[in-house]
Design a protein with these regions (language model features):
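Scaffold helices S1-S3 of the voltage-sensor/voltage-sensor-like domain
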Residues: 75-76, 82-85, 90-120
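Intrinsically disordered, low-complexity, positively biased terminal segments
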Residues: 35, 41, 56, 223, ...
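Short, flexible loop/turn elements at secondary-structure junctions
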Residues: 36-39, 85-88, 96-102, 138-143, ...
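Short amphipathic alpha-helix that is part of the acyltransferase structural core
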Residues: 24-69, 80-88, 92-99
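Acyl-donor binding region in acyl/amide transferases
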Residues: 62, 66, 102-267, 271
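Short, solvent-exposed loop/turn elements at beta->coil junctions and helix N-caps
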Residues: 66-72, 272-277
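Single conserved hydrophobic/aromatic residue that forms the stacking wall/gate
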Residues: 1-6, 10
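A short helix-loop-beta-strand connector motif used in the catalytic cores of GNAT acetyltransferases and
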Residues: 72-82, 105, 267-268, 278-284
Length: 325
């Protein structure tokens, strides 16, 4: 009922205390908080409810009332980064993340990561990358804010989330990489999906095998046809073809795929695995180096935080490589 939701909001609000607020957003006057299941159980339940609704609407999800798993509730849990709309007192969206230097290892020496059931991590990655990496997952925008009817609040929900990630790189100066997944759904056109995956592999494929899918998803479309289609050396020219061809099929390139591609020219793509416990969605592993994020995005999401919080530079000893680049 509406009354119950309203009470939920009041309990949420009490848990979203000032000490958990990370920053204000660049756009839409929203607020970003970092919480855990342990310090904000009601907010966690609301995140789980909203996540499940958003993922299920797209063809994923757990099939339960709430999407909350062991990684959300374990002893050293994933942290939840949420965008809060203070006017409507609602959560607009979120990510969950775990800092690489806080990752635990099981008795077999495997990292306790939400992606460890889908991807193998090389020794090089575990030793040279993981301690400086943030693993991101469960990125969502609340269903009501996904439509154009939500106006500017909805339009900037993803932008707001990235403000949060930008702030993380400042307050955690050892963070050099973001590791995460681009999700595509089984309902997406197969040939369109194959074009996108071929294009990503051609321009961003990881040659070092830092991370590999345990059961790689195989492209169904004829490789020769894709080779002939994407015949340019430049990302820009091939991208024009991709955009045109996907539209011919009556689809768009998924917004997050587009957004990640435009973050950094040196993004690494690790292949695609199927997430069998989550509606069989197709997860493509990616790694982005923070100091290679394109300048306009860096200014927008990272430097704006420093302007809001000049004291944060003391934490980073005033010599953060991203900001002095």
């Amino acid at each position: 009922s509406i009354r119950r939701q309203r009470q939920m909001c009041i309990r949420d609000r009490a848990e979203l205390s000032e000490d958990k607020r990370l920053r204000f957003t660049n756009k839409s006057h929203n607020e970003i908080y970092v919480i855990t299941y342990q310090d904000s159980p009601n907010v966690m339940k609301e995140i789980g409810r909203l996540r499940e609704i958003a993922f299920r609407a797209a063809g994923g999800g757990t099939g339960k009332a709430m999407d909350i798993d062991e990684y959300d509730v374990m002893e050293n849990p994933y942290k939840q980064l949420v965008v809060w709309n203070p006017e409507a007192e609602e959560i607009l969206g979120g990510y969950r993340y775990l800092l690489g230097d806080e990752v635990q290892f099981d008795e077999h020496g495997k990292p306790v990561l939400a992606t460890a059931h889908m991807f193998n991590f090389s020794e090089v990655f575990l030793k040279e990358y993981l301690p400086y990496t943030v693993e991101l997952g469960r990125s969502f925008v609340t269903l009501e804010y996904q439509s154009t009817r939500a106006g500017s609040k909805g339009l900037f929900a993803l932008d707001n989330l990235w403000d949060g990630l930008g702030a993380l790189t400042v307050i955690k100066p050892n963070v050099k990489y973001f590791f995460g997944k681009m999700t595509m759904y089984p309902s997406y056109h197969r040939q369109g999906r194959d074009m996108i995956l071929y294009f990503l592999n051609k321009h961003f494929g990881d040659k070092d095998k830092l991370i590999t899918p345990m059961k790689p998803l195989e492209i169904e479309t004829d490789k020769k046809m894709l080779e002939n289609l994407f015949c340019y050396d430049s990302f820009k020219e091939d991208y024009k073809i991709l955009n045109t061809e996907v539209r011919k099929l009556g689809y768009n390139i998924p917004p997050l795929v587009n957004a990640y591609m435009s973050l950094s020219p040196t993004m690494r793509m690790f292949g695609t695995a199927i997430n069998y416990g989550f509606g069989d969605v197709e997860e493509t592993g990616i790694l982005i180096a923070v100091n290679e994020i394109l300048e306009d995005k860096r200014v927008r999401h990272i430097e704006s935080f420093v302007k809001q919080h000049p004291e944060a530079m003391k934490i980073t000893s005033g010599a953060h490589p991203i900001l002095t680049k």
